Curated annotation (Swiss-Prot):
Compartment list: Mitochondrion
Sorted UniProt keywords: Mitochondrion, Ribosome biogenesis, Transcription, Transcription regulation, Transit peptide
Region (Disordered): 74-93
Transit peptide location on this chain: 1-64
A single cellular component GO annotation: mitochondrial matrix
Gene: Mterf3
InterPro entries: MTERF, MTERF_sf
Family, per entry: Belongs to the mTERF family.
Function: Binds promoter DNA and regulates initiation of transcription. Required for normal mitochondrial transcription and translation, and for normal assembly of mitochondrial respiratory complexes. Required for normal mitochondrial function. Maintains 16S rRNA levels and functions in mitochondrial ribosome assembly by regulating the biogenesis of the 39S ribosomal subunit.
GO molecular function, one term: transcription cis-regulatory region binding
Keyword Transcription: yes
Source organism: Rattus norvegicus (Rat)
Gene Ontology BP, a term: negative regulation of DNA-templated transcription
The keyword Mitochondrion appears for this protein: yes
Protein name listed in UniProt: Transcription termination factor 3, mitochondrial
């Protein structure tokens, strides 16, 4: 038994010596990394080996564990004298930005992504959200697009533009300085104010796909028709799509209204300045209303001409509303055509409001609309006055009386 223990002790010591020799070779190979690192690597390797050996042979040699442990400590103590002390003062590492030569920077190992950073460095790290590959809203791209950021600052409503995917994709491809800035300067030259650019671009988002020279050509055409700069600015503001129409189409529209209504050039120009969407909207409602005035309501051509030049919206008004208003004013209130022609603004008034006021005047015995008789009630004042003035000037009653009467209807 003593012989067996002696043989095992020699075997264990030979294994330790082999480990030490290998560790010494590793130390020589890693000398460029520094003495401390070599010592730590060797000690770590040796410790791992010892732990493995202890874990494997504990059951077999438990009777000699105490003796082996003492032998191991003596060997470790002897071997440690051959290695640099771990407790030695570490060498000073040169600062990269000042002491390390530039030609040696390429030889430095790359920084590990797991390397700890200080709080100051962490604050300076900019974290950007990833750009979505696809999205149904432009809001996801605002942080990544200077163009969208500038448009938002101008007051453009991106939620309305994103309903049109083709236009939304176009905006994402445009460069603000190269593609959009020149159009903004062009609109400013036309007379649009800064606070008007956002609403304009929200409605006519397609202007970004227009060639700037074509836009200038259309403005030049309007100027050739004696539209002033103020007129053009007003028309563009109230009908944003105006500049998207070709010169040929603009010319055809002006010709249509001049011919259909038999207006002079000046009256035609005044008509479209007051309602510029006549040049951009559909002509079908206009043609339909012209037939209604002539065939259903019984107005003469010159009467229609007079009314639409005074109230241009009559050309695009809802057909049903027109007929209901005329029916009540003409057949219930007994107002003839020639008086309606003088006060066409009655067609801009809600039928419900006309009914309420007429019934209140009839209740008071003051519903008299014939200018040739006493106590005449002007149709103009009848529809244009607010309730307070209507009650005081026309009905000669209080607003409270008017409200009480309305509750009885």
């Amino acid at each position: 038994m003593a012989l067996l223990a002696q043989q095992l002790s020699r075997w264990f010591n030979s294994v330790k010596l082999s480990s030490f020799i290998k560790a010494t070779q590793v130390t020589k190979h890693s000398a460029g990394l520094g003495k401390n690192a070599s010592a730590q690597a060797l000690l770590s390797s040796d410790t791992c080996f010892l732990q493995w050996g202890i874990k494997t042979d504990r059951a077999l040699f438990s009777w000699s564990s105490f003796q082996s442990a003492n032998t191991t400590r003596r060997k470790s103590s002897t071997n440690s004298t051959l290695l640099p002390s771990v407790s030695e003062q570490p060498e000073k590492i040169p600062r990269l930005e000042s002491e390390l030569p530039l030609e040696e920077l390429d030889d430095l190992p790359p920084l590990s992504p797991l390397q700890p950073v200080s709080e100051e460095e962490a604050i300076q790290i900019a974290a950007y959200s990833p750009l979505p590959l696809s999205s149904s809203t432009l809001a996801d791209y605002v942080d990544h697009s200077e163009t969208l950021q500038k448009l938002v600052q101008l007051g453009v409503d991106l939620s309305k533009i994103e309903k049109h995917p083709d236009v939304a994709n176009l905006l994402l491809r445009l460069n603000f300085e190269k593609d959009i800035k020149q159009i903004l300067l062009f609109l400013k030259d036309l007379g649009l104010e800064d606070n008007q650019l956002g609403p304009f671009l929200t409605k006519n988002y397609a202007i970004f796909s227009e060639d700037l020279e074509n836009l200038k050509t259309r403005v030049a055409y309007l100027q050739s028709k004696n539209f002033s700069k103020t007129d053009i600015a007003c028309m563009v503001k109230n009908a944003p799509f105006l500049l998207s129409f070709s010169v040929e189409r603009l010319d055809n529209r002006l010709g249509f209204f001049q011919k259909e209504l038999e207006l002079s050039v000046k009256k035609t120009r005044d008509l479209v300045v007051r309602l510029p969407r006549l040049l951009t909207g559909s002509l079908e409602p206009v043609k339909e209303n012209m037939k209604v005035y002539r065939l259903e309501l019984g107005f003469k051509h010159n009467e229609i001409q007079h009314m639409v030049t005074k109230i241009p919206k009559m050309l695009t008004a809802n057909k049903r509303k027109l007929t209901e208003t005329f029916d009540y004013v003409h057949n219930v209130m007994n107002i003839p055509h020639h008086i309606i022609v003088k006060f066409p603004q009655v067609f801009n008034t809600r039928v419900f409001k006309i009914k309420e006021r007429h019934l209140f005047l009839a209740y008071l015995g003051k519903a008299q609309y014939d200018p040739a008789k006493p106590n005449y009630v002007s149709l103009d004042k009848f529809v244009s006055f607010p309730d307070e003035v209507f009650c005081k000037e026309i009905a000669k009653a209080s607003v409270n009386d008017f409200e009480k009467f309305l509750k009885t209807l």
